[in-house]
Amino acid sequence: MKKFFGLALCGIMALAGSTAQAQSLSPSTKWHWDKGTIVVETPERPAGQEHALNLAVAPIKTVRVAFVGLGMRGPGAVVRFCRIPGVEIVALCDYEYDRAAKCQEELRKQGLIPADIYSGEKGYEELCKRPDIDLVYVAADWNHHYPVAKCALENGKHTAIEVPSAMNLEQCWSLIDLAEKTRLHCFILENCCYDDYEMNALAMAQDGVFGEIIRAEGAYIHSLEWFWDAYWKDPADNDVDNLHWRLKYNKENRGDLYATHGLGPVAQCLDIHRGDRFTTLVAMDTDPFFGKELVKEKTGKECKEFRNGDHTTTLMRTAKGKVVEIQHNVMTPQPYNRLFKLTGTKGYATKYPNPELALSGEALKGTGAPQVDNLNAHGFMSAEQRNAMMAKYYHPILKKYVEKGRDLGHGGMDFVMDSRLVYCLQNGLPLDMDVYDMAEWCCLAELGTLSMDNNCAAVTFPDFTRGHWNDQKGYKHAYATPEAEAATEAYAEAYSATQKEVAAKKNLWALYDAVKAAKEAGDAKAEAKAQKKLDAAKVAAEKAIEKAMKKATAKK
């Protein structure tokens, strides 16, 4: 492994300075009026560039990952990846060095090879130039999701981006073009697609339990009262009112800024860009009654302008005549709610406030649940009947991963998401979500703003696939053959075990501590000397792992 720690010390929770702050409305978006509807124009696909539907790359037996952004969400991702076989965490990056160093301790705890640490405004750029990284995992603040992902793709790295992965149409189209041009994955880290209820409901939908799904609802309703001051404050964001990045972004931007938690799972159930697509959008919001009061409370002065409404509602119609409603409210006090409702010709599903099902009696056949006379979906099923349905349609992906990650974030959905990402990369399969999902789920901010800024006018929804939305019939997860899956998992387990053995044998953490101690003492000469020893030991460790894995593979 080459040494980048010395020149590195780079990171992100901000990456401020030269990076322009994202806004809901992008200057490059072209649109015109047509009979009272705002028609958003779709840029032509560059010559020689092909779509990236079902994109698959050669299997990556050992996924070498770098994390950028270690404030709120990033540290949890590091913890999870430390527990996924066949992964090597190569680099940790945050604007603040101490945050990255703190995450390093999780690698020590698990006995893995120490990662190189990057910090500061531009460190992520140096990180992305490294030749020994397969995946850049972006969990920075919203303003820096796009620039880091763009840099990663331009430097030949797959990227996984926390939500929202793009803040406007310009960023959506840029990431699409980069993914299509480079043939690299651009994955949206939408964990709610891996929730137990949503995954089981998806399995039911795919088996026709609900009949034809005609309407769906999703939301992000979550009072952030206890979080506003915990969000990072970007030194270069001109945050004179000390609002921290997320409240400041809501103050300056309109639209559903966080649509993906609600939209992602229902879009999969409706086969969006896999046989259907969104065609028209209309958005409406309340005035920012709570938002203005919140700013006044924090600043002690009247808030004259607050762009985002307290509660935003977005309605979308599909090419096949379905309707989706998405809501956003991070202001008013109320219970957490993602809605997740499916209305079909044969049944109904809802997750909040309690998970329920209402189905015809036909749906219960073969589940082992007790039959009830004249069950006709006029009321919710009994708990016994519902549990029987959930058991029958318990998703195979949940069976494989969720119990291993129950305590690793949001009831296990985070671990399932990361495990599936690694699984698909290791087996050379299309990812569960592609760059078009990312664009479709993130573009509501700009499209909704266009609607609301023009008296809630109808807005056409771009076809991000540029003509290929009907090529694939139905949403599907990709799986390796049982034999290939077993071989990949055996290699991954062996690699992780070997990495731990070599890390201990080479005394890598003692060498890392010597670098850390010299740095804390301010002894640059001693730090450079210790760093040189650590670099050499890590190179030797990589060679030892490679030799051991070749030997193990040859035996088989």
Label the model's feature ranges.
Residues 2-8:
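Sec-dependent signal peptide recognition
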Residues 14-21:
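C-terminal segment of classical bacterial N-terminal signal peptides
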Residues 24-110, 518:
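N-terminal Rossmann-like dinucleotide-binding module
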Residues 24-39, 43-47, 75-76, 267, ...:
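C-terminal helical cap and adjacent loop that interface with cofactors, partners, or active-site loops
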Residues 117-133:
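A structured beta-alpha segment of the ubiquitous adenosine-cofactor-binding alpha/beta core
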Residues 135, 141-142, 146-194, 208:
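Beta-strand-loop-alpha-helix segment that lines the small-molecule cofactor/substrate pocket
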Residues 185-187, 192-306, 421, 455:
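Predominantly a Rossmann-like dinucleotide-binding segment in NAD(P)-dependent oxidoreductases
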Residues 326-337:
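Glycine-rich phosphate/pyrophosphate-binding beta-alpha loops
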